[in-house]
Amino acid sequence: KIKWFNQKTTEITPQARNKTLLRSFFESPSEVYVNNALKKDPARLKYDLSVHLGHKILHQGDGLRSAITSGGNEFGAKDQNLAATGNVHSRDVLSAWHDFESSFFAGALLCPKKPFYRFLVRNKHQIVSAQQLKLSPALLMRRVTAVSSFPYWHYFEAYQPGYLTAVYRGNGIPLPWGNMTMVSDPCPNWAVFRLLNETYVKNPQSQISILKNDDQTYLYCCHTIRVKDLAGNLKLLSLGIDLIPAIKNQGIDGNELLQSLEQDCQESGGEAELNPHVKEVIEKLSHILRIQWLGESVHVPARIICPRSLNCQRNKKCTPTHSDHRITGIESMREDILSIGN
C-alpha cells in the first residue's frame, strides 16, 4: 500500500551546504510512504518503488532498510559516527546489506542484464541515453558496472564539498578520501571533487587520470556529470574504467605508455595534453569497447591525482581543500511523518 506525504527540503545544520529531502521509506509489513515531490520526477519515483518492492520480495518487508533520501541519508550519518567511535552494530550491518540488495534488485528489474547491455553497446555507453529509457543517469551509470563484459569499472556519487554517498570499485581504485567520510586533505584534482566545487565546468566531462598511490601507478578514464537532486542540491556522478587491462588486451605495453604520459604531466606541472601515440591508443579502445566518452577524453589534458594531497606525487605540489560539515537527522523526519499519518 502506498501512502503519500508532504515534506519539504530541510537544512539539517545551519552550516550545511546541502539540503535534505526524505523521498520515501518502507514501513513494515507492507506500507510504502512516498513524498509527493516524486510525482514530478517519474524516473526517481520508478526507482524508489522498485527498491521497496525488492525489499518486500527479498526480505519479507521486515523494515530493516534505510529511508531513500536526496541530499543525505541516515546510514551516512551512522558511517560518520562509526568513524568517530569505532562501534559497529549488527543491525546497521544488516540494514546496509538490505539496502544494497534492494537497490541491486531495482537496477536488475529496470535494466535487465542482456537487453540493457545491448542497449549500452548500441548507444556507445552515452549517459544521455538514460532519457530514452526514462531512467535517471545515476541508475544507468550504476547498472553499467553490473552488466558490462569489461569488469574494470568504478563509480562514485558525491555531494559538496566532497561527501561520497555511493561507491563501486570493481577495478580496485583507491578512494579519494580514504573512506566514506570527508577528510581534511582530499586531492583537488580528482574529477569527482574538482567538478563539484568549481563555479563553471563543461558538463558532462571526461578525464584521463594517472593515479599515484605509494609505489603503484594506475591509468583511469572517468566520465563525470553534475546534476541537481530532488532537494535541489548539486550532485556529482562519476563513472570510470581502468585503462591498463584494456591496453594490454590489445598487445600494447601499458607500462611504457603510462610512463610516457606521466613524464609529460610531471614536466608540465601535473597535467598535460595527450601525445599522438596515447591519443591513438585511447581512440582505438573507445572504438573497441564502444564507449564514446572514452574517445572524448583525448581532448582534455590528463592529470596526475593522488588519494591524499598531503602525499602529493606531483613535482609541483597541490593545495588541499578543507571542510567539516556533517549531514544527519533522517530518522527524526521519518518518525514525524509516521506520527502525522497515525
PLM region descriptions:
Residues K1-N342:
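Active-site hotspot residues in diverse enzymes, especially metal/ion-binding acidic/histidine motifs
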